[in-house]
């Protein structure tokens, strides 16, 4: 018979937290059942919804919600600390789960905030169309303008006549705002008569030239005029800086035909930037060359608080932790550890409780997401069987002028029924131009959503554009452009494939992150926001606590680091880019259990008994360790000194970028120059596909797991590039063995039949939901003897119809394409199949349960060696794909993280934290 110490530790196998009846004493369970008719305690005392029907007098009635004002506050450059005194009166029980911090303040999202795509100003203008403007050439003014307004007369002092008054006196345009740019000919067939005059507005040569697309000038009068105001020298009044300029046709050189109202305006481009600028002398603001500048919209950059206000509250043990202490004993019930991940624990717990795809504004719950069509591109081409035409407004374009004639015997003569030269007739078909709308929309989607998010090494800085040296700034990220042909409509056409350079790019840092967009829009669409938010407590030991009568000190720290508490689409350094936050007030709102007083006093008496102590599990229940992976490294060894592995549940692991991982040990990390999603805290993992193998060795003598799996003991192969034995699964390069282990550890499914996990297990962070296999064919460069490695600058496809090596004006000529090689049809070239997978959001898991421990060499007692020996050292080696930046291996050692709270007397609160096998809170000790 096996000795008791070698029996499986079944009592440790509650992974997701116990039911209330499993950890409360029989007496308390009986009490809960007895009072269930008018007040339901529910699991973990979680249902304070039913008010008592008796034993509540009016003078001592219980208000559901109370507001606590801080007794002390400390506002520093990096944090805001508040302290409250919680006074819980007799016959009351304070429900800590109902408490939240009510915070008011002012947020400046900085100039990098742009909550929309495209431009708000002249978005219909061609990207290279200039504004009507003037410039000097050899000190002579040249003009490129437009005169859409038609009048009857031009006066040298008053300009264009726009009508007459009741006494038949001429009315002239008010030069401060007339002629208005939005007013012109109202009919498509309007013509300018020989006697009519024309007028328009034009920008002077002292106003900098900008493309019309995106240009804005503030109004300077209530009629909408935009001319800059200058001081009138005679009476020191402000007048509009507008001059009349008169022009004549060559045929009538001494008679004004057009008048332009030339003005200076405060021109700016609030939401666009230049992607093409000609080479002009330094300081030139207007010239003929600058007419050809090309604008592009600034990249969208949503900025809001993080999901569930991640990062706002400070959870750590280094002298800055929170406090919940009884004033009688001053023992702090909050003992946080540096290897406890409160934020991630809360995210995963919410996912287990409900549907994270539903947003809830009160707690800022809108989980980070990405558009799957952007991460994995299903390029099935475009449906463009029918051509798309555009036609002239009048249905015809250039017409010829005819006069009517009629037959006169054998000859022809003029027909008096028709006006002389009165027929306008277009010969041939209606004039039309064709545009492939479907292909242009698909190409534009690929550029805006994928190409612009390529790693910086794949982008270029446009000629004659100067960008800041700091690559974390919005100005730098916004100014860089991608080569559209690097990811055009014909790249991987017909395949479901993620562009290889994009695999290691954070897909959650994207303007299609619907959760971030929602949280940004909750705050509004302006840069400056007076906010009023409600923030719940997440720390597992006190977030569900029933606080008994007494007086308690409760204090917490709130970060003010904008990179930690705010999230942006582009992940730019918000500190450098001018964002800031100010807290004006932080109050605490709390609920008392709505119990009759005698019921509350009975509950208090029972909870004072140490047999009824409240116990809470941290949902994550793990010691989390970060191990650095240097740039381009492929192997990461880990060693854990000898210890007893009883109650150990297994490993979860993933990979993080060092740049995206803050130091939780400090309230302000000066090296954290990033504001995108933080996988370490919010669960937006995306580098799982970079693992190749992991080997696990408990001492040299222990073979674990055994050799009854497909592969060798002590080694887990995650993916195979070359699969001669056929061990891969699901049309990708993941091994059957690894797929089986993930299904077992996540869902306890070992049978690979027609069986998928139940919906309550297959949530947002689930392996099954996020596993994305894919494959494609590429040219076999070995067997295809005629293959030529034509690099990107020499590839042409759509030549003449698109810009060359940039999102610029189209150039070139129509010509047969030379790329890509055809993989289909009669002339398909020899090809190779490439396979890969992505698995975002989830963490790889290797279980270490009683069943799994049996999968090794057994002793004569039928037990694994890990049972027979009390302590073992652990060596793990992870093989990973090299990445060109430093990363971190994130390993969760799944242990039991439990707290037991005892409240023996008024104002006394004691907490005992149990952790095994990493009781010290550090896997290296």
Swiss-Prot record:
It is found in: Virion; Host nucleus. The modification N-acetylalanine is found at residue 2. It holds the Pfam family Adeno_hexon_C. Induction: Expressed in the late phase of the viral replicative cycle. Keywords: Acetylation, Capsid protein, Cytoplasmic inwards viral transport, Host nucleus, Host-virus interaction, Late protein, Microtubular inwards viral transport, Phosphoprotein, T=25 icosahedral capsid protein, Virion, Virus entry into host cell. The record marks 750 as: Involved in interaction with pre-protein VI. GO terms for molecular function: structural molecule activity. InterPro entries: Adenovirus_Pll_hexon_C, Adenovirus_Pll_hexon_N, Adenovirus_Pll_hexon_sub2, Adenovirus_Pll_hexon_sub3, ADV_hexon, VP_dsDNA_II. Its main location: virion. Belongs to the adenoviridae hexon protein family. Homotrimer. Interacts with the capsid vertex protein; this interaction binds the peripentonal hexons to the neighboring penton base. Interacts with the hexon-linking protein; this interaction tethers the hexons surrounding the penton to those situated in the central plate of the facet. Interacts with the hexon-interlacing protein; this interaction lashes the hexons together. Interacts with host dyneins DYNC1LI1 and DYNC1I2; this interaction might be involved in intracellular microtubule-dependent transport of incoming viral capsid. All late proteins expressed from the major late promoter are produced by alternative splicing and alternative polyadenylation of the same gene giving rise to non-overlapping ORFs. A leader sequence is present in the N-terminus of all these mRNAs and is recognized by the viral shutoff protein to provide expression although conventional translation via ribosome scanning from the cap has been shut off in the host cell. This is Hexon protein. It comes from Human adenovirus F serotype 41 (HAdV-41). The lineage of its organism: Viruses, Varidnaviria, Bamfordvirae, Preplasmiviricota, Tectiliviricetes.
């Amino acid at each position: 018979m096996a000795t008791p110490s070698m029996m499986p530790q079944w009592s440790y196998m509650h992974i997701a937290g116990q039911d209330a009846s499993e950890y409360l004493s029989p007496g308390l369970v009986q009490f809960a059942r007895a009072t269930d008719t008018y007040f339901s305690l529910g699991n973990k005392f979680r249902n304070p919804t039913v008010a008592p029907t008796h034993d509540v007098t009016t003078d001592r009635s219980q208000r559901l919600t109370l507001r606590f004002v801080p007794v002390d506050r400390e506002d520093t450059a990096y944090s805001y600390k508040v302290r409250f005194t919680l006074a819980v009166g007799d016959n009351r029980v304070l429900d800590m789960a109902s408490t939240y911090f009510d915070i008011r303040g002012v947020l400046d999202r900085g100039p990098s905030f742009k909550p929309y795509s495209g431009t708000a100003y002249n978005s219909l203008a061609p990207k290279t169309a200039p504004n009507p403007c003037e410039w000097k050439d050899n000190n002579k003014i040249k003009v490129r303008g437009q005169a859409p307004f038609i009048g009857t007369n031009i006066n040298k002092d008053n300009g264009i006549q726009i009508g007459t008054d009741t006494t038949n006196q001429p009315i002239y345009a008010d030069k401060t705002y007339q002629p208005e740019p939005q007013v012109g000919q109202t009919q498509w067939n309007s013509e300018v008569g020989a006697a009519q005059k024309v007028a328009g507005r034009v920008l002077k040569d002292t106003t900098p030239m900008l493309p019309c697309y995106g240009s804005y000038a503030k109004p300077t009068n209530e009629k909408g005029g935009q001319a800059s105001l200058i001081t009138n020298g005679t009476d020191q009044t402000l007048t509009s800086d507008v001059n009349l300029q008169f022009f004549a046709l060559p045929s009538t050189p001494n008679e004004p035909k057009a008048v332009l109202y030339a003005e200076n305006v405060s021109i700016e481009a609030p939401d666009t930037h230049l992607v093409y600028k000609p080479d002009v002398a330094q300081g030139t603001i207007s010239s003929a060359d600058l007419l050809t500048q090309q604008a592009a919209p600034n990249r969208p950059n949503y900025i809001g608080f993080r999901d569930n206000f991640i990062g706002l509250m400070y959870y750590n043990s280094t002298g800055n932790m929170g406090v919940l202490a009884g004033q009688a004993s001053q023992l702090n019930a909050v003992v946080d550890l540096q290897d406890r991940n409160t934020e991630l624990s809360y995210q995963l717990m919410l996912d287990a409780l409900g549907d994270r795809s539903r947003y809830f504004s009160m707690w800022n719950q809108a989980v980070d997401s990405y558009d799957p069509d952007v991460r994995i591109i299903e390029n099935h081409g475009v449906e463009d069987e029918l051509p798309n035409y555009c036609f002239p407004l009048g249905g015809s374009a250039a017409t010829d002028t005819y006069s009517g004639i009629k037959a006169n015997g054998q000859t022809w003569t003029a027909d008096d029924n028709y006006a002389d030269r009165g027929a306008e007739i277009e010969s041939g078909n209606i004039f039309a131009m064709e545009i492939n709308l479907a292909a242009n929309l698909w190409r534009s989607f690929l550029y805006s959503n994928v190409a612009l998010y390529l790693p910086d090494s794949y982008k270029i800085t446009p000629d004659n554009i100067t960008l800041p040296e700091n690559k974390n700034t919005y100005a730098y990220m916004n100014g860089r452009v991608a080569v559209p042909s690097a990811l055009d409509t014909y790249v991987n056409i017909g395949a479901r494939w993620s562009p290889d350079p994009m695999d290691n790019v954070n897909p959650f840092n994207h303007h299609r992150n619907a959760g971030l967009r929602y949280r940004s829009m909750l705050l509004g669409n302006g840069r400056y926001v007076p906010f009023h938010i409600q923030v719940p407590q997440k720390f597992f030991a006190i977030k569900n606590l029933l606080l008994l009568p007494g007086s308690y000190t409760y204090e917490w720290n709130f970060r003010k680091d904008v990179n930690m508490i705010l999230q942006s689409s582009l992940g730019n350094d918000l500190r450098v880019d001018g964002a800031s936050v100010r807290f004006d007030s932080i109050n605490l709102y709390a609920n008392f259990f709505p119990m009759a007083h005698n019921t509350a006093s009975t509950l208090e008496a029972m909870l004072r008994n140490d047999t009824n102590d409240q116990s809470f599990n941290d949902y994550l229940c793990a010691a989390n360790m970060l191990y650095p992976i240097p740039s381009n490294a492929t192997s990461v060894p880990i060693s854990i000194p000898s210890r007893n592995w009883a109650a150990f549940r297994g490993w979860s692991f993933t990979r993080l970028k060092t740049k995206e991982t803050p130091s939780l040990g400090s309230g302000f990390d000066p090296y954290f120059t990033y504001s995108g999603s933080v996988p370490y805290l919010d669960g937006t993992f995306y580098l799982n596909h970079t693992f190749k193998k992991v080997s696990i060795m408990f001492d040299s003598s222990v073979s674990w797991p055994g050799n009854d799996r497909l592969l060798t003991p002590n080694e887990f192969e995650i993916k195979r590039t070359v699969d001669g034995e056929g061990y891969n699964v699901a049309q990708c390069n993941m091994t059957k063995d690894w797929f089986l282990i993930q299904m077992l550890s996540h869902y306890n499914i070992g049978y690979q039949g027609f069986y998928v996990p139940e919906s309550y297990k297959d949530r947002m962070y689930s392996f099954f939901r996020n596993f994305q296999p894919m494959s494609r064919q590429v040219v076999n460069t070995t067997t295809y003897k005629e293959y030529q490695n034509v690099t990107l600058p020499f590839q042409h496809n759509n030549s003449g119809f698109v810009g060359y090596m940039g999102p610029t004006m189209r150039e070139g000529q129509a010509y047969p394409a030379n790329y890509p090689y055809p993989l289909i049809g009669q002339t398909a070239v020899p090809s190779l199949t490439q396979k890969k997978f992505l698995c975002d959001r989830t963490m790889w898991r290797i279980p270490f349960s009683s069943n799994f421990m049996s999968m090794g060499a057994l002793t004569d007692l039928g037990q694994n060696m890990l049972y027979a020996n009390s302590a073992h050292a652990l060596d793990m080696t992870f093989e990973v794909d090299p990445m060109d930046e430093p990363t971190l291996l994130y390993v969760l050692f799944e242990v039991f993280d439990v707290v037991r709270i005892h409240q023996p007397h008024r104002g006394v609160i004691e907490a005992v934290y149990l952790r095994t096998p990493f009781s010290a809170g550090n896997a290296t000790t």
